Swiss-Prot record:
GO terms for cellular component: endoplasmic reticulum membrane; extracellular space; Golgi membrane; plasma membrane. The record marks 270 as: Involved in auto-cleavage. It comes from Danio rerio. This is Tiggy-winkle hedgehog protein. Ca(2+) 2 binds at residues 93, 129, 132, 134.
């Protein structure tokens, strides 16, 4: 038996080495995996276009207005001056107010300045408006918090402004608006914004149903647990819990609550997480979409104890709540029923099938471990806090292969 066990362990090590070989090749010199991708073609924004395509002060963009900052405010210390020599500040007030901004805004602006010089040699980024202390903007403008800038190029060539907008998006601004023929408006999330800390998770208080019918808080799930999930056709089944993509018991975040009335259910999850909704044009009748896209009148799939199948139920209302702790469980089938509502195990990218395919190595390793070590202690619950390394790696690979528009706006913050 010892010989067979050692052979199994040796086979596992060889298999893992084969899995990791492509990753090593990608980091090394030469051709193949390590070959540098051709720079993607950047598309200029159209006049009056804004990215992301939501209102500026919403969760998916720069977040809510938090109050005007004056020189006498306690929050004035949040503003730091930007003396980057590669940026021209108009400073028509002669107070250096335009140079004051939050750290996040400064970081994005400095990144954009480099992009501008690389794209148009000899041209610099120009800031016409930054922090405003004189009340020249609309009420609740993010200029009053040092979270917004209006920009042009140093040569004031209006034909460049569409591309300048695109470069600002690529630089990581949370909201970019080709606002006028005279400038581009860019803004960022607040430094302490709960929105800036949102990925794709459920609160720890959310519950799942185990194979024996009992309920269990998501935060207490352990490897070896079997929970209710569904296949691609929406049939309810029991699936193995494999791991947490994200495991954060302490951070306070903002969640979207999707509420139905008949029967009454509440699914609480972050904006970038995928949930299944009714779609008559899809072959299975359902499709996965970001929680932030769900609206009253849409239908979600609800499981009731009295029946074995999922029921299509109309969403009554959508609202937000803050909770402490967030967890993103992964099952062997890539789906999970949380608080009686069917959701995906994945987030950030709006394609459930792609995400599930990307986690195939994780599922395979789980099966191998079960086969190689059948006598190992079940219900192992140790996992370090934070985003799992495999998930983090996939995100960075995806960001290299796909356009930023392929990701949920909040998911892009992982790159910031």
């Amino acid at each position: 038996m010892d010989v067979r066990l050692h052979l199994k362990q040796f086979a596992l090590l060889c298999f893992i080495s084969l899995l990791l070989t492509p990753c090593g090749l990608a980091c090394g010199p030469g051709r193949g995996y390590g070959k540098r991708r051709h720079p993607k073609k950047l598309t200029p924004l159209a006049y009056k276009q804004f990215i992301p395509n939501v209102a500026e002060k919403t969760l998916g963009a720069s977040g809510k207005y938090e109050g005007k900052i004056t020189r006498n405010s306690e929050r004035f210390k949040e503003l730091i001056p930007n003396y980057n020599p590669d940026i021209i500040f108009k400073d028509e007030e002669n107070t250096n107010a335009d140079r004051l901004m939050t750290k996040r805004c400064k970081d994005k602006l400095n990144s954009l300045a480099i992009s501008v010089m690389n794209h148009w040699p000899g041209v610099k980024l120009r800031v016409t408006e930054g922090w405003d202390e004189d009340g020249h903007h609309l009420e609740e403008s993010l200029h009053y918090e040092g979270r917004a800038v209006d920009i042009t190029t140093s040569d004031r060539d209006k034909s460049k402004y569409g591309m300048l907008s695109r470069l600002a998006v690529e630089a990581g601004f949370d909201w970019v608006y080709y606002e006028s023929k005279a400038h581009i408006h860019c803004s960022v999330k607040a430094e302490n914004s709960v929105a800036a800390k949102s990925g794709g998770c459920f609160p720890g208080s959310g519950t799942v149903t185990l194979g024996d019918g009992t309920r269990k808080p998501i935060k207490d799930l352990k490897v070896g647990d079997r929970v209710l999930a569904a296949d691609e056709k929406g049939n309810v089944l029991i699936s193995d819990f494999i791991m947490f993509i994200d495991h954060d018991p302490t951070t306070r975040r903002q969640f979207i609550v999707i509420e139905t009335s008949e029967p009454f259910t509440k699914l609480t999850l972050t904006a970038a997480h995928l949930v299944f909704v009714g779609n008559s044009s899809a072959a299975s009748g359902i499709t996965a979409t970001f929680a932030s896209n769900v609206k009253p009148g849409d239908t979600v799939l609800v499981w009731e104890d009295t029946c074995e199948s999922l029921k299509s139920v109309t969403v009554k209302r959508i609202y937000t709540e803050e909770h402490e702790g967030s967890f993103a469980p992964v099952t062997a089938h890539g789906t999970i029923i949380v608080d009686q509502v069917l959701a995906s195990c994945y987030a950030v990218i709006e394609n459930h099938k792609w995400a599930h395919w990307a986690f195939a190595p994780v599922r395979l390793c789980h099966k191998l471990m079960t086969w190689l070590f059948p006598a190992r202690e079940s219900n192992v619950n140790f996992q370090e806090d934070g985003i799992h390394w495999y998930s983090n790696m996939l995100f960075h690979i995806g960001s290299w292969l796909l356009d930023r528009d392929s990701f949920h706006p909040l998911g892009i913050l992982h790159l910031s």
